[in-house]
Amino acid sequence: MSIDLEWNGLDSSLASSLIDALNRQLSSTSRPSFIGPIEVTSFDFGSVSPDIELVDLRDIYRDFLEDDEDAEDVEKEAVKESQWTDEEDDFEWISRKAVRGKGLPQDVPAYHLLPPHMRYGRGVPMDMFASTPSLRPTRDIVSVTFPLRVRNGSRPPHQPDGQEPNPHPNLQLHLHITWNSNLRLTLTTSLLINYPSPMFMSLPIKLSVTGLLFNGEVVVAYEGERRRVHFETPPEADEDMPAAAAGTARAGKPLPIGQRLLPSIYIESEIGQADKHVLKNVTRVERFIQDVIRKTIEEELVFPNFHTLVLGDSGS
């Protein structure tokens, strides 16, 4: 079964909201000492929508539910410290990293309740910048929503006998997504030279992501009663997954997860001031940004890591 996104609904006002949300987060994110302030200046969703195939529909993994119970206290405290509330935003974005370490006991495998293709140990991912401060937030607030339309109906997971149907049942979608995107994201920053004194020299940098190719499996779990949506991607295609999601077998050494999910990322770079000498399309800089993007996907969304959207009240 295929799922269609109403891509025309992603207009400029939604892009502006996303830019504002990104810049709010970037302004409070730690950066390496050699990187100046980072600002997103433009964003365009592009004209190409992803090709989404529904591979499987099942009950939600208990790992999502158990992690939610541990995250409740952290989540409530985070909302108190923020100027944003559920009444002002459509949903709240909470990183799993805010509650890491509060899961199952040390001597109990975290994967014992999961199907075979999801049984991977819970671990702490490596930092993409190694010895430099992390550029990842522990909590983000996002105030945008994406219109969704399902082409063909599908039966929800099993409902126990003798119970009234839940208007918002828990269900989990396994999707195979192929997206040859022509989105465009432009940001500016600067390279700081801190010798012989701090900020002795600043070199402007302009980076533009002009497109990417995403090809992989994504798990989307909807927790109806709590109105939460969990996102993650399996670390590897497995024999237990349906053939449509397994993809083409690879010969030789497997590719890194980030490169498998994002085999192509197109980036344009400019270093220097526009009215003076400018270096364009610097290969090393572009490769560095590609590595950062892929590493971020690995550390934020590849199991055992996942993200959760806390939806606002539906009013019903």
Swiss-Prot record:
BP term (GO), one: phospholipid transport
Signal peptide as annotated in the record: none
Entry keywords, A to Z: Endoplasmic reticulum, Lipid transport, Lipid-binding, Membrane, Mitochondrion, Mitochondrion outer membrane, Transport
Molecular functions per Gene Ontology: lipid binding
PROSITE patterns referenced in this protein's UniProt entry, alphabetically: SMP (PS51847)
Superkingdom per UniProt: Eukaryota
Coiled-coil residue spans: none
InterPro entries: Mdm12, MMM1_dom, SMP_LBD
Membrane topology: Peripheral membrane protein
Cysteine pairings via disulfide bonds: none
UniProt xrefs under PANTHER family: MITOCHONDRIAL DISTRIBUTION AND MORPHOLOGY PROTEIN 12 (PTHR28204:SF1)
Record family assignment: Belongs to the MDM12 family.
Known partners and oligomeric status: Component of the ER-mitochondria encounter structure (ERMES) or MDM complex, composed of MMM1, MDM10, MDM12 and MDM34. A MMM1 homodimer associates with one molecule of MDM12 on each side in a pairwise head-to-tail manner, and the SMP-LTD domains of MMM1 and MDM12 generate a continuous hydrophobic tunnel for phospholipid trafficking.
Domain free text: The SMP-LTD domain is a barrel-like domain that can bind various types of glycerophospholipids in its interior and mediate their transfer between two adjacent bilayers.
Protein name in the entry: Mitochondrial distribution and morphology protein 12
Organism (species): Postia placenta (strain ATCC 44394 / Madison 698-R) (Brown rot fungus)
Gene symbol of the encoding locus: MDM12
